[in-house]
Structures are given as C-alpha cells and as structure tokens.
C-alpha cells in the first residue's frame, strides 16, 4: 500500500475498525488518522467521550478508508461505514472539530453551534 503513495496512486483499505481515540483507528493493520478531524486526546477533558463516540459510530464494523497521505507512523484518510462519512459524523455529533488546515474547511459547517466553546482545538488546526 505504501508504494501507491510514491507512485501517486489512489489507495483504499478495508477491514474491521478498532478505535484508538476520537480521530484514530486501526483498519487492516494500519493506524488511520481521520483526515481533517481534530478530536481531543485521551489525556484531555473530552478525549474519552470522543473515543467512545467513535466506537459507537463504527461498532467494530468493517469500514473502508480512502487514504490521502501519511502523518508520522499513521496513514491519513477519509473512512466510510457504508455511505456514511465517519470523519463527518464524529464532527456532526459534536465530539470533534474541523481541522481546516487539513480539510480546507470541509467540515466546519456541520459542527454543532457550541462545539468550539466546549472542545479544545490543537493550535495547528486553527
């Protein structure tokens, strides 16, 4: 799969989702960071709530992730459960924020009205 990045090809992986935190899960043996999503870390006030919300969304189901890049030791992508955009859903439910630096603002309009008052955002996403 990593070869497709070097060749500029589209990559997609599918498998059972095992949630790590509110914006990272393991799929088909790869750690996948949800592109454009900023959820609090487990050490932050809403981190466990975000993780539990993502677990409720994916329910250990088979998901498909369209990989768009790499970040540290993870791949980055948009993941789907059927036709549902999981990245959008965790934001829509109010457990994560749009990270405009990486999403281009794609998810900002679906954030709940109070999300930016309740959740911490990483400086690089502002």
Label every PLM stretch briefly.
Residues 2-126:
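Small beta-barrel nucleic-acid-binding modules, primarily SNase/OB-fold domains
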């Amino acid at each position: 799969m990593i070869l497709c990045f070097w060749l500029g090809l589209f990559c997609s992986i599918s498998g059972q989702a095992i949630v790590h935190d509110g914006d990272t899960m393991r799929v088909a043996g790869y750690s996948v960071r949800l592109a454009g999503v900023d959820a609090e870390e487990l050490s932050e006030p809403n981190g466990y709530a975000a993780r539990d919300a993502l677990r409720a969304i994916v329910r250990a189901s088979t998901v498909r992730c369209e990989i768009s890049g790499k970040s540290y030791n993870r791949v980055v992508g948009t993941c789907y459960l059927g036709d549902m955009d999981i990245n959008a859903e965790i934001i829509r439910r109010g457990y994560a924020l749009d990270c405009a630096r990486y999403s281009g603002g794609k998810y900002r309009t679906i954030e709940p009205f109070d999300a930016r008052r309740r959740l911490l955002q990483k400086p690089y996403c502002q």
